[in-house]
Amino acid sequence: LNNLFGEITWFYPTQSSEIVNRSVTYNYMESSSQRPIWTTGSLARTTWVDSSVFGLPHGTSYNATGTSYDVVGNTEGATTYYQHETGTDQVKSSATTTVAANIESGDYDITQGQQGGADIRGDGEFIMKIRRFVPDFLSQSGNTQITLNLRDYPNSSQASSSLGPFTITSSTTKVDTRARGRSVSLKVANTGSAQDWKLGGFRLDIQPDGRR
C-alpha cells in the first residue's frame, strides 16, 4: 500500500525467476468502475512498509552481488534498503541512476459523419493528419520526451512521427508534428536524471486527411 498516491502494489516473481522481479499496481484513488487504472513495472521489492509508519514508504530488494553465505540451500546475496518518494533518481551506494519511466495511451482514431441523409460512419477508416500538439503538465522538472506512435492498419507495426520523438521543456508552448495515420497513441517518457512530470490534458490538432 502507498497511501500517498492511492496505490496497491503486488510484487511477484515471473515464471523463470526464483526471486521477486516484477510488480503490478492498482490506483484505487483515481480509478472508476468504467476506467480502472492498472500499471505494470519491473520494480522489485521483497518487503514494504507504507508511509503511515515512517512518513515515507520504505522497502527492500534482493541484491545478487552481495555477501556470500556458507549455508546449504540458501541463495547468495544481500538486501538493499530503500526510502521511496524522495527525489527523482535512484541513489544507491553514492551512485545516482536515472529512473527511466514512460506511460502510453491506447490507439486513437477518428470517426467521420456524413452531411445529410443516413449517418454513415467509418470507424478507424479515415486517415488523420496531426499538425501539432499542445503539451500540458501539471508539474515538470527537467525535460520530457513525447512520441507519437502511428499505425495505418491494426496489425501494422507502430512507427514514430518522422520528426519525433519530441523533447518538451517547461517553456514549450506547442510542437509541430506533421504526422499522419489511421490511429495514433501518445507516449510520455523521462530518459535522464533529475526529470519528473505529472501529466495534464494534452491537446492534439487533428483533421481528416486523404489516403495518399
Regions found by a protein language model. Give the residues of each.
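Beta-sheet repeat architectures centered on beta-propellers
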Residues: 1-212
